[in-house]
Amino acid sequence: MIDVVALGELLIDFAAKSTDSTGYPTMAANPGGAPGNFLAALNAYGRKTAFLGKVGNDAFGNLLLGTLNAAGIETRGIRVDDSVFTTLAFVTFDESGDRAFSFARKPGADTQLRWDEVDKSLIDEAKVFHFGTLSLTDEPVRTATQKAVAYAKMQGKLISCDPNLRLPLWPDEDAAKEQMLWSLHQADVVKISDNEVEFLWNCTPEEGADKLLTEFGVSLAMVTLGPDGCLLKTKTASFRAACPKVHPVDTTGAGDIFGGSAMARLLELDKSVSELTEDDLKFIGSFAATAASLSTEHSGGIPSIPEMDAVLKAMG
């Protein structure tokens, strides 16, 4: 049995590490993509996962497949395409470790996944179907994602969504908002950042969580607040978790690691989302906030996921 299957982008994050003797940046190639980071966190904390997506038949595609396999993620749902190159992201940082992105994705292999290439048996086997909005930027992967979500809902799967705003990948803000809002309407569990809440509704995290619960039919809203922790809310309970003090060097993948860690704890509880108590939300949120915070002390997405013992120790 698979706990979680995710559909979405796989890419290489090129992160500036230093400068050479001429002043040009040197960059590290880190395997990433939000759904892959999300699944890798789940695997790190004892869950079984599978990926649906596409990479190019190139060195970076091979690196991504090898990385996911090493993380224990089932990769039989990943297609390899000879005609397009694996997507690349270039990440730069400010003094606090926050990121700015540019992409080589015109097109990237992840955008070329077709519905007929999606391994539906992996959805059948899973308890949870997870997706983000970067697989809604372009065809044919947009249609593949929409049909996969509909299929998963028909099969009675728990639907998890991370809207994951990356404006450079959209033609304009309105297109991004349209697809993000569609995604949120599909989901039972949502992980969203305070910045994304502000982008969509220009409101506070608390107001955003309430919107998700009352207007979108979401059962569990999780709003990440950067260094201020997170807010978790259901219709009957809420909890706000703090983060441990860390010295961030790279926030790449921290939100994904939060989401995967939270989902791992939710699955450990083995109860309906509608039945979650405040203590349950503390069990989920405190662990996820700590795991995400610790990940920022290391570079990259998947390589930065902290071990379970390190998270529990930091929680005290």
Enumerate the language-model features and the residues they cover.
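Glycine-rich phosphate/adenosyl-contacting loop at the front of the ribokinase-like
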Residues: 1-74
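Conserved phosphate-binding/catalytic region of the ribokinase-like
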Residues: 1-5, 150, 205-316
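Active-site metal-binding loops of divalent metal-dependent hydrolases
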Residues: 10, 134, 163, 257
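Conserved N-terminal subdomain of the carbohydrate kinase-like
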Residues: 48-133, 312-316
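Glycine-rich phosphate/pyrophosphate-binding beta-alpha loops
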Residues: 87, 133-137, 292, 298-301
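Structural alpha-helical scaffold elements that stabilize or flank donor/cofactor-binding regions
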Residues: 121-122, 182-183, 214
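Conserved beta-alpha-beta core of the PfkB/ribokinase-like small-molecule kinase fold
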Residues: 128, 136-211, 228-229
